Amino acid sequence: MACGDELRLPPKELKDFQRKRAKAELKAYFSDRELSSQCSRTVSDYFLSSDEYKNAPVIFSYMAMKDEIDLSIIMKKALDDGKKLCVPGMYPDSNDMDFYYIDSLDESFSCDNKYNIKEPSEKSRKVEVASIPGNSVFLCPGLAFNLEGARLGRGKGYYDKYLSRVKSNVILCGVCTVNVITKAIPCEENDIRMTHLLNEYGFISLHR
């Protein structure tokens, strides 16, 4: 496919094409352990020095897959600073998830899901969506993003469905490497846009 021809594809086919391309780019990037570790440190430094982090009562993070930026540094710092920390847990046989409070990264996590992602234990307390305070920050993974805040997920809608329930004024931050920031991502009615991007070049407000 010639450069630019993909933009003529119907939205669903374009998303599928972009997912395939982004997965290949991320696989190559994260195969370099030294590079990916440096990226994690750099991204963490940018975020932890931001006012958005300092003002956040709750940090909603994620447990990284092998082709995602590891946010362990951010999560440990949030706990050390006395902030509340939450990570997602998925429901079997559905595309739904909730967030759960965790008190330590040394907790017993489960990987009993189709993505082999670490999830909080059954003893973890679920976040009540209606009680999420303003200025909380959601650090959202994705395969690709654009500068208008569009996010390309893995196609199951976990984050879009959850974030559509959040009514408080929160920060929605897409976390990615700069090589998967693209010009055009089809944005459908149910897609939730990010307010910020975080990558190895900085923490960027998108002023949506």
What is each of the regions a protein language model found here?
Residues A2-P133:
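N-terminal active-site beta-alpha-beta segment that forms phosphate/nucleotide-binding
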Residues A2, D93-R208:
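Conserved phosphate- and dinucleotide-binding cores of soluble alpha/beta proteins
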